[in-house]
A protein has these predicted regions:
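Short gly/ser-rich loop at a beta-strand->alpha-helix junction or flexible surface loop bordering the NTP-binding
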Residues: 1-185
């Protein structure tokens, strides 16, 4: 089977997604299950069920995040520590985990290093940049602080985000109000 020759659209997608593709994307590119299995036995790596890295190297943070978004499905977005780290908050360290959120009716689940949480709270400031869909900076900071595991780390995340002008105190207050409206009559 040898080296793959990709059409222009697929080659662009491979570059855009840092060498990570989902099963449906490979099928759309014309690859059979047998061809995918052959490449997995020789050149590719399974990152998550149905998501493949098109080389055998150690996956980068970006590749793992893209894999998490592909595995979680349409409308998935980075959240919490992963999103805050993506926005550049160094105090937000997701470690080996990739945290994503999905809208209902999708379910909360954990697979390998992927943590998928369902959220009914809308985020009007969600951002899409290339293959990344990411919650707003304010939501990322509040989620990251909530799940940081330590009051000191939570404070560091908030302080760094404000000092870097990623968010304002008004942004954080507005996001808190959006969360609290969910429980109002």
């Amino acid at each position: 089977m040898g080296l793959m020759t990709w059409d222009d659209a697929t080659a662009w997608l491979i570059r855009e997604q840092h060498g990570v593709l989902g099963r449906a994307q490979l099928a759309e590119a014309g690859l059979s299950e047998a061809t995918v299995r052959w490449h997995l036995s020789r050149r590719w790596r399974i990152l998550l069920p149905g998501v493949y890295q098109l080389d055998r190297g150690r996956p980068t943070r970006a590749q793992r995040e893209i894999a998490g978004l592909l595995a979680a499905g349409p409308k998935a977005a980075l959240r919490g520590l992963s999103a805050a780290s993506w926005w550049g908050v160094t105090a937000a360290d997701p470690g080996d985990w990739v945290h994503v959120m999905v809208p209902p009716p999708r379910r909360t689940r954990r697979v390998a290093w992927l943590d998928v949480a369902r959220s009914t709270i809308t985020d009007p400031a969600m951002v899409t940049r290339g293959p990344f869909q990411v919650c707003s900076p304010a939501r990322a900071v509040l989620d990251a602080a909530q799940h940081s595991g330590s009051p000191d780390v939570a404070a560091a995340i908030g302080i760094e985000a404000v000092q870097r002008r990623l968010v304002t105190l008004d942004d954080l207050e507005e996001e808190l109000c959006r969360r609290n409206q969910r429980w109002s009559a």
